[in-house]
A protein has these predicted regions:
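Surface-exposed loop/linker segments characteristic of extracytoplasmic
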Residues: 1-136
Length: 136
């Protein structure tokens, strides 16, 4: 999907309450990992993908990381989706989770126990994987 493409709500076939619209990624443009600010890194600097704090770098893609908030996800139980880092994942300064907005307008406080697979299902609008409220 390109930046200027229109996507009607009717194209979200997995359900508006099962699809992420926005996720919290607090602390930008600084780099945060597991509740600690890190100097350097500069991944939020001006680049072809930089579009401002509200629709910037993270509007391109997001996903889980390793438990340390730095390494890539490995596909096992140590992968982290919430409050690991503010590069790709859901990140907030709240104890026990961060906020996400679903396409139906509901705001959910998502805990760090959110599985990477459930995160992927919530990120896709038409993959046929319906996510129950108990899963996140």
């Amino acid at each position: 999907m390109s930046d200027d493409a229109f996507l009607p709500l009717t194209s979200i076939t997995d359900g508006l309450g099962c699809t992420l619209l926005l996720i919290e990624q607090a602390g930008r443009p600084d780099v945060w990992r597991n509740g600690k600010k890190h100097d350097g890194g500069g991944q939020f600097g001006m680049s072809a993908n930089a579009r401002g704090a509200w629709a910037g770098w993270g509007s391109i893609g997001f996903g889980p990381s390793g438990a340390d908030g730095v390494s890539a996800a490995t596909g096992d139980a140590t992968d982290c989706t919430v409050n690991c880092n503010n590069w790709f994942g859901i990140y907030g300064f709240h104890h026990g989770g961060a906020h996400s907005l679903l396409c139906d307008g509901a705001v959910r406080f998502v805990s760090p126990t959110l599985s990477p697979l459930t995160f992927a299902y919530l990120s896709n609008r038409d993959d046929g994987r319906l996510v129950s409220a108990a899963e996140f």
